Amino acid sequence: QRQMCIRDSRNMMKIVYNRFIPFGRFTALTVLVWLFVKEGVALTARLLNHEKIHMRQQLEIVAVCLLGTVAAHLLFGVSAWWMLAAVPAPLLIYGLSVAIEVLLPPYNRAYGNSCFETEAIYNQHDPLYTRRWWRHLFAWITYIPNRKYPYIPPEKRPPMMKN
């Protein structure tokens, strides 16, 4: 199991190469600031940018959950222990998004039709997308109506950006 850390002035992502996570047909999986990559998979600039978009989406959800629980604690006296729910919140919201897409046709593209994946697919070719975060804060919400942003099969996605 190899590990490396990518740092720039805007974000930090710990990359873990292993054979267990991600599972199935996926080549990479982002969980907050950890990027799990299958052994033997080349980490291209486009794939790294795609996963950085997912990292930003998840950190936005964590921030909102933390701010919401702090506000609820200060305003209504709700227990501060609810702040612990902010950590698994992105995974639960991702799962809910995919579950909603499973209920809507076409069923075979549920993950690709989720608003989170649609935002990442449409913007993975732009190396500056994650650096201009203030312009794209909660941009995944605009990708919820998937008729405006249809699913792009892998063979029709934009070519890889230059490294």
Protein language model annotation of sequence segments:
Residues 25-48:
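Short pre-active-site segment immediately N-terminal to the catalytic Zn-binding motif
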Residues 39, 56-57, 124:
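Activation segment
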Residues 46-58:
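Active-site recognition of the HExxH zinc-binding catalytic motif
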Residues 33, 54, 120:
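Divalent metal-coordination and catalytic microenvironments
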Residues 14-19, 23-26, 73, 80-163:
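Metalloprotease/metallohydrolase-associated module, dominated by Zn2+-dependent proteases
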Residues 1-6:
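Short, small-residue-biased leader/transition segments that mark boundaries at the very start
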Residues 59-75:
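Membrane-interfacial alpha-helical segments at the cytosolic side of multi-pass membrane proteins
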